[in-house]
Swiss-Prot record:
Start-end of RG C-terminal-type zinc fingers: 631-658
Enzyme Commission number(s): 5.6.2.-
Annotated zinc fingers (RG N-terminal-type), start-end: 3-42
Protein name, UniProt field: Reverse gyrase
Gene name of this polypeptide: rgy
Species of the source: Caldanaerobacter subterraneus subsp. tengcongensis (strain DSM 15242 / JCM 11007 / NBRC 100824 / MB4) (Thermoanaerobacter tengcongensis)
Toprim domain ranges (all copies): 555-712
Cofactor remark: Binds 2 zinc ions per subunit.
Source taxonomy: Bacteria, Bacillati, Bacillota, Clostridia, Thermoanaerobacterales
Cellular compartments annotated: Cytoplasm
């Protein structure tokens, strides 16, 4: 089977940038024009053909890297590590960047050898170190490395130089008699005028924190790589005004050299550090990582005796976190009295830290605040093994109106406004109100009784202390930061850590547990495991040898579809820096496996063009060759097109955003990394986007793989990475067939419609036209199905209907039987059933619901939302179990799979987090912001999923006969809940039991109805699934396009009706082209597409059949 489709892609030839086939791109070959033959050396072939162009850049990089690697090896007898390999490629591509990496991977070594490399090539280098001693050490190492490189002149300056040495330095420095200049951060500050006049090919800053202490140093560094002061001042001025720095002339901005800086330990402050982003395309990064290998243990008995027992069990390498200095002193005294050697952050900490570092102290004791000395300030991967918390770190907030913080005021007032529409219209944007004005408004409109109820309602997952008028919220970020000291990346290994929490309060512990699970997906274990865990922690540190950095690490680029998804992933991976590549933002993260660069393609990059062949498909010797061009979008009118045009074909604007720029940026990054992983959506469209990117990147990086993320969580990410694969070419071919069929039939039918109706907004397609026919047929059936009914309401509130116009004042009820019935749960949602339920419940258009689902998926709240499956995996079942355990309802668990193993699951929550908890997490800024409607849709999904994994509730049903002289009707009514089950999530309506007696009719209403209901958006999608027309990914789009073309409208009851235009269009199409828009033909075509997906049918033979069909349409013209 061919590993390519034979399609032709514009801009994809690695040499000329012209059209190339995906077949040749897969092989890493330029197009046939550049290289007519496939055999032999590519570079030689291009030279012989006199066609060498862009390929030379790629070839040069590979050659230069081989030379650099040999040079590197010659200096330290080791090849570059994965980190150093990645940095070297960036260096060779003349890029400026931040070195973001853990301790022990050779950042300084890389800087020194890079300096020698540049110097050997005739360039000038400045190396900047934070202290004089480090300058001397670096100079010494450089001299050692350069013994065989006699032509490299190394000049360094320290304050300890003797007078003659200083005079010699000054002469050589002023005259530029050096290849490598080694200086301190202080030298940068003092010699600004001189350094600003010099231009270096490379400036390497070993400790950027020291340089950033003075903002003037930033100007100096930028001057040193050839950026003019005018460009710096203009960029700074634009930053202050919020303007675009791209307006500055390119020649003024363009650096002549490269700037490489080490990562910062603290976030750079002020506006000046933003110059690096604006002028060099990178932000000063900090080494942060989400990589954690921590086991959490809760100990409920909170006594000093128990604490001492645990400390003696752990022995050494302990951080003890306490809530206050006062309590800390009491604990420290007790431990010292019992022989524990410890230091305290509030008492000669620097001395204690050094003693702890060298091993003469077992334990350091400090206060657990987010910026505490022990929480953030230390990094000793081999020394710190255990974190012990004396109580849960938490925030306490007053609930008294006069003292309540803003978030409580805002949350409660927002809720109050929901039930007061007029007031809500007045208070449109609470964000604009000052806190005091907000407080006064709350006091004015909300009574103390209502306020207390709102507190209880809106903060259900916090600990509420009614006596002290406080709510207590766990400080989960401090807990994560502090416990994270125990598990660090050192070199290329991740140490094991143990976090032990002493907490008596069950409710507070559960609150922390839920938040920790949401953010880190970590679980808790029992106290009995501690001894085993201690051994594990020791073993991971013993395994870390001094040459652990020799283990090869990979640099990888991961490409997702949307920036939102990229942002979500970067949060749980914890991005260390952000870099701009053209129009792409790239987040850089450090994981245990190496460096990850995360970016987004922003959807499809290629689509069929229209001009070549038959609507973008060339027919050559019986084969169909699609031509794909980059998607262009007009910035003025928003129109999309693919043809190579200098102006928008719709509004004539020359402001065109071409996705070719994204492709070029992705190829550029691919040259830097070891591997590329494509993580587009797990469906046919995602596969095609992945394929388009893959074939474009393959010429510069053959290591391209595909992953499917069915949930955007750390668990989903790790699982996907473990199951990497190649792109599925059958899925790609299936999408090609769908797109060509849509283009051929859709274009031809649309052109005929537009010509006949003189309306360029009209369109047609198999599925949309078939569905339009259903709506029209349903209207006809509906109009013929009128009947009269009377609705009665009895004096016990029960309602029922009877056919005909009937006028009675009382009825008699006879109880036929009473019986128990177990009510089975509904299956979890798939796309059609969820669209139906959400549309009915919230009265939203299905397209809007799909957008809400897309957001919930991309932000990591639900599984993939385009699915026909109702299957629940073992992971999903564990989520249900975990939540029921948390709320004390585990006896109601009844795990169900609901379907066979397949590519997708049902739509379900990805974590055991209730809608109420999620609302709390949003308020606490733990979770990304969601609108109230997003929460409602999530609640619908959560409740249906939980119900699907629970026991069936048992009800007592009464079968009753309601009769009168003119009618009798039978009804079955639940009158008692015998056993609870899934009803705790989806309540069951239970009626008051009937008695055998006469009931009065308290109201009656006679009206005309129809036995055949019109379609709603929800029922139409149900029908599409039932009749196998369309797919989960297209249901909502089909309905949406019928609205956009003004073929259908919704009446006041949200029912679908055809417009006069819709009826005329369908009449025209059905009279002339019924064979192409009838249901059976459309269904058979869906089956053909599926057979291409599975590899049963060759996509070329299917295209041939479609082409023959199209010819019939063309003949009918």
């Amino acid at each position: 089977m061919a590993l390519a489709t034979g399609a032709k892609y514009y801009h994809s030839c690695i040499n000329c940038g012209g059209i190339n086939t995906d077949t040749r791109n897969e092989k890493g070959l330029p197009c046939e024009v550049c290289l007519p033959f496939e055999d032999g050396d590519v570079l030689k072939g291009l030279k012989l053909n006199n066609s060498l162009k862009g390929y030379e850049k790629y070839w040069n990089l590979n050659q230069q890297y081989k030379e650099f690697e040999e040079f590197f090896f010659s200096k330290i007898n080791k090849k570059p590590t994965g980190y150093q390999r990645f940095w070297a490629k960036r260096l060779l591509l003349s890029k400026s960047f931040t070195l973001v990496a853990p301790t022990g991977v050779g950042k300084t070594t890389f800087g020194l050898i890079s300096a020698l490399w540049i110097a050997k090539k005739g360039g000038k280098v400045a190396l900047v170190f934070p202290t004089v001693s480090l300058v001397e050490q670096a100079a010494k190492r450089l001299i050692e490395f350069s013994k065989e490189d006699e032509d490299v002149n190394i000049l360094f300056y320290t304050s300890s130089l003797k007078k003659k040495e200083r005079e010699k330095f000054e002469k050589n420095f002023s005259e530029g008699n050096y290849d490598i200049l080694v200086i301190s951060s202080q030298f940068i500050s003092k010699r600004k005028e001189q350094l600003s006049q010099k231009v270096f090919d490379l400036v390497f800053v070993d400790d950027v924190d020291a340089v950033l202490k003075s903002s003037k140093n930033i100007d100096t560094l930028l001057n040193m790589i050839g950026i003019s002061q005018k460009a710096i001042d203009s960029t700074l001025d634009n930053l202050k005004k919020g303007n675009n720095s791209d307006k500055i002339q390119i020649e003024e901005k363009a650096p002549k050299g490269r700037l490489i800086v080490s990562s910062a330990t603290a976030k750079p402050k002020g506006i000046k550090p933003l110059l690096f982003r604006e002028l060099l395309g990178f932000e000063i990064g900090r080494f942060t990582t989400s990589a954690r290998n921590i086991t959490n243990v809760r100990i409920k008995e909170k006594s000093l005796e128990k604490l001492l027992y645990i400390i003696n069990l752990l022995k050494d390498g302990i951080l003890l976190f306490v809530p206050t200095e006062e309590e800390g002193k009491e604990i420290a005294n007790y431990l010292e009295e019992h022989g524990v050697k410890l230091g305290k952050t509030w008492e000669d900490f620097e001395k204690s830290f050094e003693k702890f570092k060298e091993g003469s102290l077992q334990l350091l004791c400090g206060i657990y605040s987010y910026y505490g000395k022990l929480v953030r300030g230390i990094d000793l991967p081999l020394r710190i093994k255990f974190a012990v918390f004396w109580g849960t770190p938490s925030f306490k907030f007053s609930t008294k109106l006069e003292n309540a913080p803003r978030f409580i005021l805002e949350r409660n007032f927002q809720d109050y406004l929901e039930n007061n529409p007029k007031l809500k219209a007045y208070f449109k944007d609470l964000q604009r109100l000052s806190t005091e004005k907000l407080r006064k408004s709350v006091e004015k409109y909300i009574s103390p009784e209502t306020w207390e109820k709102l507190i209880q309602k809106n903060f259900p997952t916090t600990k509420f202390d009614k006596e002290k008028n406080l709510i207590v919220i766990p400080d989960v970020y401090t807990y994560i930061q502090a416990s994270g000291r125990t598990s660090r990346i050192f070199g290329t290994s991740l140490t094991k850590g143990i976090s032990i929490l002493f907490e008596e309060d069950d409710s507070l512990f559960e609150l922390l547990k839920a938040r920790l699970l949401y953010l880190t997906e970590e679980e808790w274990t029992e106290e009995g495991e501690i001894e085993h865990l201690v051994k594990e922690a020791e073993e991971t540190r013993k395994a870390i040898s001094t040459d652990s950095s020799s283990k090869d690490m990979k640099s990888r680029m991961i490409i997702v579809e949307s920036p939102t998804k990229a942002q979500t992933i970067s949060k749980f991976l914890e991005k260390s820096s952000t870099r701009r590549y053209g129009s792409l933002m790239v987040h850089e993260s450090i994981t245990q496996e190496g460096i990850l660069l995360l970016t987004a393609s922003k959807g499809h990059l290629y689509d069929l063009e229209t001009k070549t062949g038959l609507h973008g498909v060339e027919i050559n010797d019986g084969r169909f060759i699609p031509y794909y061009n980059s998607i262009k979008r007009c910035s003025s009118c928003g129109a999309q097109f693919t043809d190579e045009l200098p102006r928008c074909p719709y509004c004539n604007s020359d402001k065109i955003d071409d996705k070719k720029k994204i492709l070029e940026a992705l190829r550029d990054i691919a040259m830097e990394v070891d591997e590329v992983i494509i993580a587009t959506d797990p469906d046919v469209e995602g596969e095609k986007i992945g394929w388009d990117i893959s074939q474009y990147i393959k010429p510069v990086n053959k290591n391209v793989q595909r992953i499917e993320m069915h949930e955007i969580t750390k668990f989903g990410f790790d699982k996907a990475i473990r199951n990497r694969r190649n792109c599925d070419v059958n899925l790609v071919k299936s999408q090609i067939v769908r797109r060509i069929e849509d283009r051929w039939v859709g274009f031809e039918l649309s052109l005929r419609l537009q010509k006949n109706f003189q309306n360029s907004n009209l369109s047609a397609g198999r599925v949309q036209s078939t569905v339009l026919g259903w709506i029209l047929e349903k209207e006809i059936e509906h109009s013929k199905s009128k009947k009269t009914v009377t609705q009665f309401t009895l004096d016990n509130g029960f309602k029922f209907e009877v056919d005909g116009k009937i006028d009675v004042d009382e009825v008699e009820v006879e109880i036929v039987e009473e019986k128990e019935q177990a009510l089975s749960p509904l299956p979890p949602f798939n796309t059609p059933s969820l669209l139906t339920a959400a549309s009915q419940q919230f009265k939203l258009p299905v397209q809007q619901i799909m957008e809400i689902l897309q957001t919930l998926f991309e932000l990591g709240f639900i599984t993939y939302h385009r699915t026909d499956s109702t299957r629940i995996s073992s992971t999903g079942q564990k989520i249900a179990r975990s939540y029921l355990e948390k709320i004390g309802k585990i006896t109601l668990l009844s795990e169900r799979e609901w379907g066979k193993e397949g590519a997708h699951e049902a739509i379900r929550p990805v974590k055991p987090i209730s809608p109420e908890e999620l609302s709390e997490f949003i308020t606490e800024k733990i979770a990304a912001y969601l609108s109230p409607m997003h929460i409602k849709v999530y609640s619908l999904i959560f409740n249906r999923f939980m119900a699907s994994q629970m026991t069936s509730p048992v009800v007592i049903n009464q079968k009753i006969l309601i009769k009168n002289g003119s009618f009798q009707v039978e009804r079955e009514v639940p009158v008692k809940l015998q056993e609870e089950g899934w009803n705790i999530f989806n309540p069951i309506t239970v009626y008051t039991p009937f008695e055998e007696k006469k009931y009065s009719v308290v109201s009656k209403r006679t009206y005309t109805t129809h036995t055949v209901p019109l379609f709603t958006q929800a029922s139409l999608i149900e029908e599409m699934q039932k009749r196998n027309i369309g797919r989960p990914s297209t249901y909502a789009k089909i309905v949406d396009i019928l609205f956009k073309r003004k073929y259908i409208i919704e009446d006041v009851y949200k029912r679908l009706r055809t417009t006069a235009l819709g009826r005329k269009v369908y009449s025209y199409l059905s009279e002339r082209y019924m064979n192409y828009i009838n249901e059976e033909t459309t269904r058979q075509l869906e089956k053909l597409m599926e057979s291409v997906e599975t590899g049963e049918k060759d996509y070329q033979s299917v295209l041939k059949n479609l082409y023959e069909e199209l010819n019939e349409i063309l003949i009918k013209n």
